[in-house]
C-alpha cells in the first residue's frame, strides 16, 4: 500500500512539472507569435490599400468633375485664420494667413477596406479632380512648400474628400477714409470657381455662416486696428459665361486713434494755443509777435504735409484734414489779428515808444526855450515900465501865468500818451479765440467719436 501511494505521488509530481514546463515554454517560446501576426496584418493592410488606390486611379480621368452630366458638384468650404495683418492704408490691401479647407464627394473614389478614412499624401492631389477655386480680390497668393507642400488630403470610403492647404493671401481692402482716423472698414475675402458656373459646381459653407470662418485668438497682427469680428455670406454674379457663386468673408476693423492723437492732434492743438499767446504781448512788441505768427503758420504747414504721408492720395477731405484746416485757420487768423493791431497802432501816436518819447522830449525843450525867450524879453524892457508898476509884479505874474498855462497841458499830454497800451482788438481776441477753438473741439470730437460707421456691402458683426 505504501508502494502504491508513493507511485501516485511520483505521478502527480511529474504531471505538475510537465504543466509548469509547458506554461513556461508557451510564455517564452511563443511570445513572438502576436508580433509576427500584427506585422503580417499590417503588411496585408498596406498591400490592400495599395491595391485599392491603384484600382481607384485605374481609368480615373482627373479632367472631368464628379457627377458630370448627372448632378451638380457641391464644394463645402471653411477657413481657419492663423494670422491677420498687416493692413496697408496706402495700398488699400491686407495680408492674411489661413488654412483653406474644401470638401466634395467623388463617387469614382469609393472603396471598401479595413479603414473608413485614408490619410493620403499631397502628391495624390495632382492625380484627382480638385476644385478650380481662386480669390476674386486677391493680389498675390502663396502656397507654402516648406519643408514639404503644406497640403492635406483625406479620402473616406464613400468617396468624400477633404483637401486642406495653407495659404498666405494679399487681398484688396477698399477703404472710405472720410472719417479717418476714426474710421472703420470691412476687408473682404472673396473666392469661388473660376470656370464652373452654378449649373455645374456650387459652393456652400461647411458649418453655416456662423462658424465657417474662425480667427485664432492670437491671430491679430495689427498695430493700428482692432479686429472687431467677421461676417460670412455669399454673392451671385452674372457674366457672359453664366452665373457664379462668390463666397465672401468680411473682416471688420476699427482704427486705433492713439497714434494720431500723439502725432497730429496734440501738436495741432498746442500750436493753436501757442499762436494765441501773442494776444497777451504788448502791441509794440513787433518782433516777438511776428515770430509767434510766422512760426506757428510754418508748423501747421509741416504738420498738414506729414499727416498726409500715411494716407493714399484720395480726392476728398478726411476728418483729420478738416481738423488741421480749422487749426490752420486759427493760426493764420492770429497772424492777421496782429497785422490789424499793428496797422492801427502805426496810425496812432505811439506805434514806436522810443521815437515817441524822443519827440516828446524835443517838444518839451522847445516849449521851455519859448518860455525863456519871453521871460528874457520882459526883463530887458522892464526899465520902461511906469514907476507905479511894481518891478516883480508883472514878470512874476507873467511867469506864473506861463508856468500855470504850461504845466497842466504837459501833465494832460503825458497822462494821455501811454507807450505800452493794450489794443481793444487784443482784449477781445483773448476771449473770442479760445472760446471758438474750445467750441470747435467739443463739436468735432462729439461728432466723430459717437458716429456709427456705415460700411457699404457688409453687415456689422454681432
From Swiss-Prot:
Q: Which residues lie on this side of the membrane: Extracellular?
A: 32-260
Enzymatic reactions: chloride(in) = chloride(out)
GO biological processes: chloride transmembrane transport; gamma-aminobutyric acid signaling pathway; inhibitory synapse assembly; synaptic transmission, GABAergic
Domain of life (superkingdom):
Eukaryota
Which loops or segments lie on the Cytoplasmic side of the membrane, by the record?
Answer: 341-427
Membrane topology per the entry is: Multi-pass membrane protein
Residues annotated as glycosylated:
45, 145, 207, 236
Molecular function, one GO term: GABA-gated chloride ion channel activity
Query: Can you list the GO cellular component terms from the UniProt entry?
Result: chloride channel complex; dendrite membrane; GABA-A receptor complex; postsynapse; postsynaptic membrane
Glycyl lysine isopeptide (Lys-Gly) (interchain with G-Cter in ubiquitin) cross-link, renumbered residues: 355
- Show the disulfide pairing: 173-187
Q: Where is the protein found, in the record's own terms?
A: Postsynaptic cell membrane; Cell membrane
Where does this protein hold 4-aminobutanoate? 101, 164
The record ties this protein, via PROSITE patterns, to: NEUROTR_ION_CHANNEL (PS00236)
The family database entries (Pfam families) matched by this protein are listed as: Neur_chan_LBD, Neur_chan_memb
Q: Where is the composition biased (Polar residues)?
A: 395-405
The cross-references to InterPro entries, in alphabetical order and at most eight, read: GABAA/Glycine_rcpt (IPR006028), GABAAa_rcpt (IPR001390), GABBAa5_rcpt (IPR005435), Gabra-1-6_TM (IPR047024), Neur_chan_lig-bd (IPR006202), Neur_chan_lig-bd_sf (IPR036734), Neur_channel (IPR006201), Neuro-gated_channel_TM_sf (IPR036719)
Give the signal peptide range. 1-31
Signal is among the record's keywords: yes
Q: Supply the alphabetized keyword list.
A: Cell membrane, Chloride, Chloride channel, Disulfide bond, Glycoprotein, Ion channel, Ion transport, Isopeptide bond, Ligand-gated ion channel, Membrane, Postsynaptic cell membrane, Receptor, Signal, Synapse, Transmembrane, Transmembrane helix, Transport, Ubl conjugation
* Region (Disordered) location: 375-412
The subunit structure is: Heteropentamer, formed by a combination of alpha (GABRA1-6), beta (GABRB1-3), gamma (GABRG1-3), delta (GABRD), epsilon (GABRE), rho (GABRR1-3), pi (GABRP) and theta (GABRQ) chains, each subunit exhibiting distinct physiological and pharmacological properties.
Q: Which family does it belong to?
A: Belongs to the ligand-gated ion channel (TC 1.A.9) family. Gamma-aminobutyric acid receptor (TC 1.A.9.5) subfamily. GABRA5 sub-subfamily.
Entry text on domains? GABAARs subunits share a common topological structure: a peptide sequence made up of a long extracellular N-terminal, four transmembrane domains, intracellular or cytoplasmic domain located between the third and the fourth transmembrane domains.
**Protein name (Swiss-Prot/TrEMBL):** Gamma-aminobutyric acid receptor subunit alpha-5
| Protein species of origin | Bos taurus
Please name the gene that encodes this protein: GABRA5
Amino acid at each position: 500500500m505504501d508502494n502504491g501511494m508513493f507511485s501516485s505521488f511520483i505521478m502527480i509530481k511529474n504531471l505538475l512539472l510537465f504543466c509548469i514546463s509547458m506554461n513556461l515554454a508557451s510564455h517564452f517560446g511563443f511570445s513572438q507569435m502576436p508580433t509576427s501576426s500584427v506585422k503580417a496584418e499590417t503588411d496585408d493592410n498596406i498591400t490592400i490599400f495599395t491595391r485599392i488606390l491603384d484600382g481607384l486611379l485605374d481609368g480615373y480621368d482627373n479632367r472631368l468633375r464628379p457627377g458630370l452630366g448627372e448632378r451638380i458638384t457641391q464644394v463645402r468650404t471653411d477657413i481657419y485664420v492663423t494670422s491677420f495683418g498687416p493692413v496697408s492704408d496706402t495700398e488699400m490691401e491686407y495680408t492674411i494667413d489661413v488654412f483653406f479647407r474644401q470638401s466634395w464627394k467623388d463617387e469614382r473614389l469609393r472603396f471598401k477596406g479595413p479603414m473608413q478614412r485614408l490619410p493620403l499624401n499631397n502628391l495624390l492631389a495632382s492625380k484627382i479632380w480638385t476644385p478650380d477655386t481662386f480669390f476674386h480680390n486677391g493680389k498675390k497668393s502663396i502656397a507654402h512648400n516648406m519643408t514639404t507642400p503644406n497640403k492635406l488630403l483625406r479620402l473616406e470610403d464613400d468617396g468624400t474628400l477633404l483637401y486642406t492647404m495653407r495659404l498666405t493671401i494679399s487681398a484688396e481692402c477698399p477703404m472710405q477714409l472720410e472719417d479717418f482716423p476714426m474710421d472703420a472698414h470691412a476687408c473682404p475675402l472673396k473666392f469661388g470657381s473660376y470656370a464652373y458656373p452654378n449649373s455645374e459646381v456650387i459652393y456652400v459653407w461647411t458649418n453655416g455662416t456662423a462658424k465657417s470662418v474662425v480667427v485664432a485668438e492670437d491671430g491679430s497682427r495689427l498695430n493700428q486696428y482692432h479686429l472687431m469680428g467677421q461676417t460670412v455670406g455669399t454673392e451671385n454674379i452674372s457674366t457672359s459665361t453664366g452665373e457664379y457663386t462668390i463666397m465672401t468673408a468680411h473682416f471688420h476693423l476699427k482704427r486705433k486713434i492713439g497714434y494720431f492723437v500723439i502725432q497730429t492732434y496734440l501738436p495741432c492743438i498746442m500750436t493753436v494755443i501757442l499762436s494765441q499767446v501773442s494776444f497777451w504781448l504788448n502791441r509794440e512788441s513787433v518782433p516777438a509777435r511776428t515770430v509767434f505768427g510766422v512760426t506757428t503758420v510754418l508748423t501747421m504747414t509741416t504738420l498738414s504735409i506729414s499727416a498726409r504721408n500715411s494716407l493714399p492720395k484720395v480726392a476728398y477731405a478726411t476728418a483729420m484734414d478738416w481738423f488741421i484746416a480749422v487749426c490752420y485757420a486759427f493760426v493764420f487768423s492770429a497772424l492777421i489779428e496782429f497785422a490789424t493791431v499793428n496797422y492801427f497802432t502805426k496810425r496812432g501816436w505811439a506805434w514806436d515808444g522810443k521815437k515817441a518819447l524822443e519827440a516828446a522830449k524835443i517838444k518839451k525843450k522847445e516849449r521851455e526855450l519859448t518860455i525863456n525867450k519871453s521871460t528874457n524879453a520882459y526883463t530887458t524892457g522892464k526899465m520902461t515900465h511906469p514907476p507905479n508898476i511894481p518891478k516883480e509884479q508883472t514878470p512874476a505874474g507873467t511867469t506864473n501865468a506861463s508856468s500855470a498855462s504850461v504845466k497842466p497841458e504837459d501833465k494832460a499830454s503825458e497822462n494821455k500818451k501811454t507807450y505800452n497800451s493794450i489794443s481793444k482788438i487784443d482784449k477781445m481776441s483773448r476771449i473770442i479765440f479760445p472760446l471758438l477753438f474750445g467750441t470747435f473741439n467739443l463739436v468735432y470730437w462729439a461728432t466723430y467719436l459717437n458716429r456709427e460707421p456705415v460700411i457699404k456691402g457688409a453687415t456689422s458683426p454681432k
